[in-house]
Amino acid sequence: MALGVREYRNISEIKGPLLVVEGVSRVAYDEIVEVETAAGEKRRGRVLEVGMGYAVVQVFEGTTGISPTGTVVRFMGRPLEIPVTEDMLGRIMNGLGEPIDGGPKIDADERRDVNGAPLNPAERAYPEDFIQTGVSAIDGMNTLVRGQKLPIFSGAGLPHNRLAAQIARQATVRGEEEEFAVVFSAIGIKYDDFLFFKKFFEETGALGRVAMFVNLADEPAMIRLITPRAALTLAEYLAYERDMHVLVIITDMTNYAEALREISAAREEVPGRQGYPGYLYSDLASIYERAGRVKGKKGSITQMPILTMPNDDITHPIPDLTGYITEGQIVLSRELHNRGIYPPINVLMSLSRLMKEGIGPGKTREDHAEVSNQLYASYSRGVELRSLTAVVGEESLSERDRRYLKFADLFEQRFLKQGERENRSIEETLDIAWEILSVLPEEELVNIKEETIKKYHPKYRAG
């Protein structure tokens, strides 16, 4: 779309961050705009709506100080683009891809549209191959697969930022560590959170393989809508042009949806559920569906978007619609967090729909699927018995039931709980699982084949 620069001075309305420009022609949706005030200050914007002879422009920096007279609006004839290069790894940028770390200007030979290139569905390859995060609750029971989109559902005050930073530092495709990169997109975060991520990546030495796109809470809402798209544009370049395996972590998608609702209200659109626009589903899909693998390309994009559920409500429109688009979810538990368990992952509410594609011989270990199924069944039984114990007392339970109670405690303290900088291999995760399963009678391990028990059960391995 190369329409050339067109200049107009006839602003008919200013409302919130929006300008309505009359008498325009050959203006395209999503076109980038330059707004020059009467005082000579230049601001950037984007076309949100095009009608018969008019265009609605969202000004990134807001419309304060802009008057209908004396203001020049220039339509630039192109969409918003960012530079893309491998040199952006190790750099910290704002939501528009501009460096904010005090380093040199990004020198790139190529610029790309932040909306990404259309991808033919027939060219998609099915997600497969294990991504090791070093977190037992994810690797062992909700395995992340290369090309998958697996969100983390959290709540206010829960340690999702710490978990996101840990995964960004530790995640890797086994055997291809040197070709793995992380693109980290922070949407509407507080400055304290930005400093936490920056310090964590610098101290742990992870910053060299991480490209950070940061949008702070005091920045315009429109930038929140661009930030994840800019991050994914770089991820697509690294994956499909540089053959890298890219993990994209986006936090917090709730801030993104709130910005979308704010802009929708300013445009006076008919609201949908809880005031969010009716196109919330398709808008979220335009971000989540940029994950995946492409036939004939070595690289891949894996997404772990993080969202905080308002009032811990998993039926809220944001997590509800996200669940329809993505391939599972990791759910954080406030009850586990209050008991001092980190990461507080509720495995009974969590699910990775593509787990079966990334585990087993040659990928993780032959016993992985059986052990995971047994952990789910045994922990679920232990949690049920806790509720029963609160009514009848532990003395009323059988010896078998007491073993399940002990297993549930060990599962939370030995398997779920781990250090913030503790990076467990999948072998360590499965070995811990066998240790805690060994407190149960062998006849209770009904989800594991006898030959697998003979090979991996601590009782037989010790012999």
UniProtKB/Swiss-Prot annotation:
It is found in: Cell membrane. It is a peripheral membrane protein. The keyword Cytoplasm does not apply. One of its GO terms (molecular function) is proton-transporting ATPase activity, rotational mechanism. GO terms for biological process: proton motive force-driven plasma membrane ATP synthesis. Keywords: ATP synthesis, Cell membrane, Hydrogen ion transport, Ion transport, Membrane, Transport. It comes from the Archaea. GO terms for cellular component: plasma membrane; proton-transporting two-sector ATPase complex, catalytic domain. Component of the A-type ATP synthase that produces ATP from ADP in the presence of a proton gradient across the membrane. The B chain is a regulatory subunit. Belongs to the ATPase alpha/beta chains family. Has multiple subunits with at least A(3), B(3), C, D, E, F, H, I and proteolipid K(x). This is A-type ATP synthase subunit B. The gene is atpB.
